[in-house]
UniProtKB/Swiss-Prot annotation:
Lineage, uppermost ranks: Bacteria, Pseudomonadati, Pseudomonadota, Gammaproteobacteria, Cellvibrionales
Biological role: Involved in iron-sulfur cluster biogenesis. Binds a 4Fe-4S cluster, can transfer this cluster to apoproteins, and thereby intervenes in the maturation of Fe/S proteins. Could also act as a scaffold/chaperone for damaged Fe/S proteins.
Subunit structure: Homodimer.
InterPro entries: Fe/S_biogenesis_protein_NfuA, FeS_biogenesis, FSCA_dom_sf, HesB-like_dom_sf, NIF_FeS_clus_asmbl_NifU_C
Name this protein carries in UniProt: Fe/S biogenesis protein NfuA
Encoding gene per record: nfuA
Entries under HAMAP family matching the protein: Fe_S_biogen_NfuA
Keywords: 4Fe-4S, Iron, Iron-sulfur, Metal-binding
């Protein structure tokens, strides 16, 4: 169930923006990039006719439709879009208190499961060395492409950390994962822990 509030002032502002696009049937699409992670960002984009996904949730508003990415809906729970006019024109604000909160179930996309394990189990251990690891992308064959940062970049123990720590943890927690691969440039040793 969709639990997002778009205030009247935000609807008026968005409707005016959409009218300037001169595109019949244009709406907005709301989604969260990197949901459930500290890097989560809540986004609003134009959604031209035909650009909405079949699984999107739709909110019919006065003069336009708002589409919500299905994968993002749990992270948009209790979100509020508001517009506050001021002397400089105004500001559109999006508050999504659950966008950074991990919400994982058996049905969650594999990317969300990987991010959950990385940010809640792996990175707290790497943080003691000033390091971190993040998911760059997931290949079509189920391989997690990872990037190390901070003290892990250039660290001489990164192979051991990858195989015995990160990969082992991810493979135990996410059996559908085919494996992991590191794409970090470890020749830069300026922040390396070892």
């Amino acid at each position: 169930m969709l639990n997002v509030t778009i205030t009247d002032s935000a609807q008026t502002y968005l409707r005016e923006l959409l009218e300037k696009q001169a595109c019949e049937g244009i709406g907005i699409r709301m989604f969260v990039s990197n949901p459930g992670t500290p890097q989560a960002e809540t986004c609003i984009a134009y959604c031209r006719p035909g650009e909405a996904e079949e699984a999107d949730h739709v909110m019919e508003l006065s003069g336009f439709n708002a589409y919500f990415e299905d994968r993002s809906v749990p992270f948009l729970d209790e979100a509020k879009v508001d517009y506050a006019p001021d002397k400089m024109g105004g500001q559109l604000t999006i508050r999504a208190p659950n966008s950074k909160m991990p919400k994982i179930s058996d049905d969650s996309p594999i990317e969300d499961k990987i991010n959950y394990v990385l940010y809640n189990e792996v990175n707290p251990g790497l943080a003691s060395h000033g390091g971190n690891v993040s998911l760059e992308r997931l290949t079509d064959d189920g391989m997690a492409i990872l990037r190390f940062g901070g003290g892990c970049q250039g660290c001489s123990a990164v192979d051991m950390t990858l195989k015995q720590g990160v990969e082992k943890t991810l493979m135990e927690r996410i059996p559908e994962l085919a494996g992991v691969r590191d794409v970090t440039d470890h020749s830069d040793k300026s922040n390396a822990y070892y």
